[in-house]
């Protein structure tokens, strides 16, 4: 009886098995037999009349255990008292039925069979071990070819393939016993068994040392890796060929009788039956000594059936069941969304949960939710039962159940008690970030819908149009505590993505607050003075003063010392009312609300209150302004009718002007002054400018203050109020209602030239309506795709970052990154203050121009600090970053900085990787799916000039200009910069000047804000003559390299360079224009090189052959469509492309060294560019560029490391290898942020840094030295360092390597944890690899731990782990002390026997009574 208690799974007395790591390896036949409880000999399952399992069949009770608890099959022994007895009649052990879930069987195969995973999973492990190709292997295994195993003295080769005839001939030629050749899996098994791994490894290493060429070393390295992994893991190669097959327990492949005498069965039973049938038939054939050919066929069929069992459809035909559906094999059980990993281990259904529709609950407090009584009764049943018993209202659970079912009144009282202070968790699918699950205290409500507090809607992304939410009940005390302390909605005021409050009013509340804080001239009661806030309220109630009138009010304020003082404010009664809600704090003065509050301002107010007044105050404040917002919006009664949409009076004049402009462009095109593409660009531009003008006119009309008869201001237009306050609608939508709809896009992203001129108020014409449907439909189909894509991106990000946890406080690294203001096209997009907020300073920051230290290294920068640094005018500073953190696992708190959701230093154990992944993935659905071509013209025209954003002095860098005949200054350098400096000579802004830019300012000139600095042609890239001379065409052969295009519309001809390589005769042409002087010699530049202008495809020639040219004249123009303004891959695809680290199609070429450009010999249709290093000791570097691509450098140009030699998007790998980790990080951060900024989404840089850190974990070995690492292998930095330390300790040469950038999918599949990788993608491949290498999973990440069913090592789970470690170490100390004491006692006891008795009490310490 006693033993029984310990075996009961629900009994806590038995300690669960504790383990630290999981190892997976190949199973040897002996291992398989040791698991097995018996061999399965028959394919039968159960007897269909008695429903009893057949003996020796797939469900045999003798092997797997009894069908009923404690009862043998024939019924001879029943009940507990016989437990452990084996019945002599039916051979069944009397025990729990549960053992049928854990006992395995086996099948002895009559012939060995290859395991398909090791055969077909690429690269084929068996093939690599034997150095055979997969085709040859399959021929041997499926009995088509013989293979020579022992050549003997014949001239055959080991491993040589022979057909049946060749085998016969060889036997005739050499005699039967002269050599051994075999066929089938036996042959392969013999060959594998014969391999001596150590000798093989030695041999391969020796070969590798000698191997030359490209492919050979690669192949040897691959084989060497496999051999090494077998050596290290202790696996034997012949175990990849199976002689015994394990059979999984019957309860895991159940057979369920349906009504009507039929059975539902798992597909595995069918697959096993095929194997057993064929195996038995094969045994019989071998016994009967059947002809070879029949036996062989049977063996092949056996091989195929085992293949199907392990991985159906991997090879040959898919085996289907009776219903033509492919059978689910063992591999399919693990794979995919429905597989074991993702369906059962990572995502489970939970008890004590329910779901219902949500409705709004405006009278709830922020920490409450309304729970329907019916749901609560069901969810809290166990608590109610126990409470009923405790109160003595029921004596048994059955009685309690009856009471609850009848819904007696006392049950409701008890439910109230139970629910008090017991938080529940609410979840809205899709849970895109951690705020998708929050805890609330339930209040019971009638009805059937859950009530949700309006302020948390934005966190859940919920609305009340029929959304459903799920409720979960945390049961244990610990779970309730965590829900209350960590997940309560009041603890999640700030968003983890950017640290801004996420509990902000929206829609109605914003409209109410906006209306409340309006100020209007001439309202009733203007100029009155009130002594305190109560007086204001009385006057409002009495109707003596209007909400919006200008009055003076005395408001109590807190000064710096914390004393209450009265201050007078010019304000309105509405603002005074709002001010009365503010917490009393010096940092939250009345000025905070004494202004017109729009959405941004409200968020700012909440942020300030949260930062300075603490959490409790701010939560109360949020609740109060929500109530006030709703009430005021309701009292204001703002609504809108058709007349609220105002059409500006001058609409048609603006439209007609634009029409005239467009006519001009058409005419210019007819006259051949501009190309079709340029015309299109200009027309689109003109219309978007027209749209902007119209919008401005409309906004100024609609926002203008109108006066009533009595001279008081009228209420603002209600549509304007809604849009302006940020409650609903936007300027774009108002423009469509009252201006013009504007330009429409085709589904492929192109913009239709003819805009929709009508607005919705006037109504669209049929044609306009048709144009509109085009893009609208695309928008809808986009949305559906977007959700799936965004979800997949999040999943990949989570997978790559899941094991990034804060593991220590400080890693003590010296490294850091530089933070500076982010500037995009000369406009500041993120100030330095924003970027350094919540980071730790790496070096002391000094006030510019002085030695005063503003903040010391190692300090966390808070809001005040950031402001101080901004005001001091610091340009850049060094900050700690997760990228440079040197922690072994995860990151350290100092490198990470502030936990954005709490506003304090990040805690140890915070899962920052997952937070980063969620922050980047969650806004994914808001991003667009589209790829914009011509850089987003719909967003308003191409910028073609730049104005000074600051005032200061102009300084040029790398000046290279010339003045043309009209006296205009043009830049002809490639890397010229224009810098604006302040009076201290500090750089305020810098702009790169493109080739052909026209300058309006001179060196040293003082500029004011808004002065025009320079302009350029946004649509074409000019090629400018540097010296005067005569143009001479070279190789510009008409018809081959140039086509004369006569425009049908204009009758004008233009010369356009075409792709000369396409023509058969044109392959060796080099089309260019050279300048010759009067003497017929080419004009040379300052370096003495002749001035030649190579032409690229699509260039338009602007000069005739033999034409006189002045310096600064345009020789040719390249349309920007040819020299693309980078194809802007917008939105989600761009983010995915960046994180997957894909090489862009025409990626830019980056100079690897400083040096001078030389053009080398051309090769086929590539141009050879080499850089001669300025530093003599370095090698020259060569690049091949496709001909006809525009190359922005010319012969003899000096380029610096990191300059672009060919335009385009750079490949992130190049940035890493040439310019280092920090440059890569900056590139990634800027590019990702650009995409999100376009949608107005704020994400903190550190999240992107965390992901980039995870992408940079691996090192690629460039030279293996004398270590065990192999060239080209990807290893973790730690493994790399460890291997090198080992080598150095032995005095050997260390390996060389460099960090390598992996895309997130690759990085996830290459994590150290094979369990995590297998649950992500390509399950079979990962597991095959892991088992061959005998990989160990140390269970450090979150995913592995969830899968094996323990607490995750982050958050409270991490704390539990630490406590366990401490306890274990203390136990060790105690045990150690006890051992020493025992030894001392033994030493004392040795000389005098009588003292031994006294020595015993020494050992008796309190700890030893465990």
Swiss-Prot record:
Record-linked CDD domains: RNAP_beta'_C, RNAP_beta'_N
Any GO BP annotation: DNA-templated transcription
Annotated binding of Zn(2+) 2, by residue: 811, 885, 892, 895
Pfam family, one: RNA_pol_Rpb1_2
Disulfide bonds: none
Amino acids binding Mg(2+): 463, 465, 467
Keywords tagged on the record: DNA-directed RNA polymerase, Magnesium, Metal-binding, Nucleotidyltransferase, Transcription, Transferase, Zinc
Binding residues for Zn(2+) 1: 72, 74, 87, 90
Keyword flag Aminoacyl-tRNA synthetase: no
Cofactors required: Mg(2+); Zn(2+)
Cofactor binding notes: Binds 1 Mg(2+) ion per subunit. Binds 2 Zn(2+) ions per subunit.
Reaction it catalyzes: RNA(n) + a ribonucleoside 5'-triphosphate = RNA(n+1) + diphosphate
Enzyme Commission number(s) from the entry: 2.7.7.6
Main function: DNA-dependent RNA polymerase catalyzes the transcription of DNA into RNA using the four ribonucleoside triphosphates as substrates.
PANTHER family: DNA-DIRECTED RNA POLYMERASE, DNA-DIRECTED RNA POLYMERASE SUBUNIT BETA
HAMAP family from the UniProt entry: RNApol_bact_RpoC (MF_01322)
Subunit structure: The RNAP catalytic core consists of 2 alpha, 1 beta, 1 beta' and 1 omega subunit. When a sigma factor is associated with the core the holoenzyme is formed, which can initiate transcription.
Family assignment from sequence similarity: Belongs to the RNA polymerase beta' chain family.
Designated name of the protein: DNA-directed RNA polymerase subunit beta'
Organism, scientific name: Ruegeria sp. (strain TM1040)
